[in-house]
Structure formats: structure tokens, C-alpha cells
Amino acid sequence: MRVVKTVVLTMLLAGGLAAVPVARAATAPGVAVAPQYDTTHVYVAPADFGKFVASLTATFGGTTTKQRVFTVTPTPSETLSQLVLTPVGSLSVFGFKTPIPHPFGTERTGYLVTDLDAAIRAARANGADVIVAPFPDPIGRDAVIQWPGGVNMQLYWHTKAPNYGQLQTVPENRVYVSPDRAADFTRRFIAFAHGKIVSDNPRAPGVEIGRPSDTYRRIRIESGFGKVTVLVTDGHLPYPYGHEMTGYEVTDLADTLAKAKAAGVAVITEPYSVDGRQATIVQFPGGYIAEIHASAHRR
């Protein structure tokens, strides 16, 4: 999604973000493909791999690619790898059979881009560090970048363009940052992604981060990559808040949780309803923690 720089600046100022100049890359062509190519990266033990994938598809539906063993890092390693395509989001699952080279495992998501070199230039111009320089993988090229606030993301490009079906609902990438880095991260990521702020609530209900007596700042962003929810906190988070990297939107929360429980998924926070959303946090076999939500207005 292309956004004229002046419009972006207006929205940022309206959202209370400081007017610090961003590099000129904001005017460069966007490199996003589509939200279904935003894949959450999940690392599980090889022994839990099959059970985890089965629990995902039992909970959300969808399909999987064939499980294979690959080297997906620039240095020697070996991992089980499988792509899970659900109606509510895509996931890349890794089960390393060797020690995991640093910093792999810290990247929350992979964004497919139209041109990896152009994406790297745009990311750098907008303040991201390239913490893993571009390298070839079995089906294309990858890199890992880090935004202000310590937010790590993979950028990837495929030699043969993939073709995933459109999502039923677009998941949210849930990013926890400090007040010191919230404005910087938000401004720079929006410039890179050609995104927009769709809401900025400085007094969002604290129940969303496990603190029902408090409020916090919540910023919601949309771009061609998908959705990002920025949760601005002081870091005083009760477990499991902060561990969930993705929020999945479903049509019926109770029905989804019934399927999840039958597949061995644990509901680890009490479901709540606030601001038109019903939500909870769950833990899948293998340890993966995720938020699941539905519109409270759906019947």
C-alpha cells in the first residue's frame, strides 16, 4: 500500500508520535506482496513437531506442505521444516536437529518481498539494522533485520513466486515495545511498509496485557504486509503476556477453543471481552503461545 509521505506524517502527529525525519526510502516503491505471505516463525523440538502441526490444523483448519529437512541458515545447521497455511494465518515451523545458529529463533515473522535487495535498502534507510546479511536458502534468499526496540523480522524472496490462497482473516503481528522506542519503531516501520495507523489508543484496557486495573498504549498498523499491533508497556507483564507473537482472528472464539482443547491446546488466560473483541491466550503442544480473538459483535 503506497501512502504519500505527508499523509503518513499527519497521521503520526495525530497519533502523538514525534516528528523526527525518516529517510527518503518512504517514497520508494513498496516491496510487500500480501498478508498471506507474512509467516509467523515457530521453533519447536523435533519430538513435538508433528503434534504441534496437527494441533494447528485441528484448531484453525488449513493445509500443510510436506515435512522436509533443510539448511535454512547461512552457517551449517539442519532443521525439520514445514509450512502451515490456515485461513487465519501462515506459519513456518522449524524443528532444529542441530544447535540453532545465532540469531535464528529470535525473528518473529517472515515477510515475503518483491525484491530482497530493494527491501534491505529500504529497511536500512528507515533505521533497521541488518543483523543477518542476505544469504541463499533452498528456495530463494533471506535476511534478518532488527527495528528500534529490538524487533527482529526475516525478509525473504522466492526464486519461484509462491501462490498461497487469500486469508479469511488477517492475523496481527503483536509487538511489545517500551515507551522509549514506540514512536521510533512505529514511524520507521510505517515508512518502510508504506503502512498507516488505523488506531492509537493511549488508554487501552489493561486486561489486554493481563493488568485489568491499568491502561496502556496500543497502536494498530495496517500495510501490504498485514497487521501489526504495537503494545507499549513498562515491561511489568504477567505471564504469558509478551510471549505471544501473533494474534489470530476467528469467527467464533468458543468453537475455536473447543477444537483447540480437543487437540491438546491449553487455554492459559481467562477469555475476556473488551472494545468489541473477545480474546484469550493459548499454548500449543511444543510450547508455542498465541492470542486468539473474535469480534464480540459476531453471532
How should each PLM-predicted stretch be described?
Residues 19-25:
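Sec/Tat signal peptide C-region and signal peptidase I cleavage site
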Residues 156-161, 292-299:
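Short beta->alpha transition motifs characteristic of CBS
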Residues 7-19:
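Bacterial N-terminal signal peptides
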Residues 91-96, 128-131:
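Catalytic cores of nucleotide-enabled group-transfer and carboxylate-activating enzymes in metabolic
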Residues 31-34, 41-88, 125, 133-148, ...:
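Core segments of cupin and vicinal oxygen chelate
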Residues 143-164:
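Short, structured interface segments
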Residues 1-6:
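Positively charged n-region of N-terminal signal peptides that target proteins for export
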Residues 35-47, 82-84, 96-122, 141-146, ...:
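Vicinal oxygen chelate
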